[in-house]
């Protein structure tokens, strides 16, 4: 029996937002360090025989000294526990320059049984009769000489590992990772013509089997598995049914492979159902946004807690520039102070959609309004007016807001005079 820990897409050194922890480290960067440390502790606890890392150990080809030292220390923890490490270079570990060396190569420490490869093709006998075939990402498509040499070894168990995209036989489309430079497609023949016992891949950040109909099991019998990323990089990474962390593979004495999904805690993320603002007032939109924000707050209210601060997004659809300018942004911001990142992207309603029969009648009802209704009159007018059509959309909201402020100041002067 052989126990293998399958890791990939650690992305050590990934940063986002400007929040720092008490040590002065970017909070999202620290999230990655915590996740890797937990994974290493799990691997040691489960007494795995080896660790396979299918690329993207680092998030960038120029990681910081802190990032390098942290990852080195984690790999050395494994080595101290008698667990060899086999890592290959992914697209984030490298750049586009042929002469440059993959950043992950600095981790190579064969005397400690830490093998971090950037070579085109390497084979390790990781246990008696078990061979690990490793193909790194660097200059992948230029490896015309290497490709014919990639072959399984008859009479042994053969595991193939590399970093890249494949064609999903169920979806009949290339699997893709957002915000991913130098993405390559693994040749189909390389996966099918070598009778691999199992294929353990990296690059796609959602864990699971290629061609799976249920997202949880190998329904298509491909024996091709992506471990997914160690942490979720905001909304660029999709939710994952199998969670994120590492995968424990056990090879039985009969050569069978069984998997156990291991997860590590993730920072909470909330992507709320978009609010359709077409039939709502600015006040109603504001209330809905705040209601959703409050649902993500800790018991203490809108208090920022670095370890658990959520990432939150609320999309607003079919809103007009005037209505968006009238949102109570101060109240919304006050209820978002607990978040690590808060985003409220909006899509504007087109003028043609907005000119309904009801809006055409608004002007007929404006005569005789009191001064107290001036802002309401302005908001109604701006929603069905063509006045702003000649202004670019990115400027329209700013112009509308400033005009509304001007009307408000005039209204306040009139009311004070009355």
Model-identified regions with their sequence ranges:
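A conserved active-site cap/scaffold subdomain adjacent to cofactor or substrate pockets
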Residues: 202, 208-289
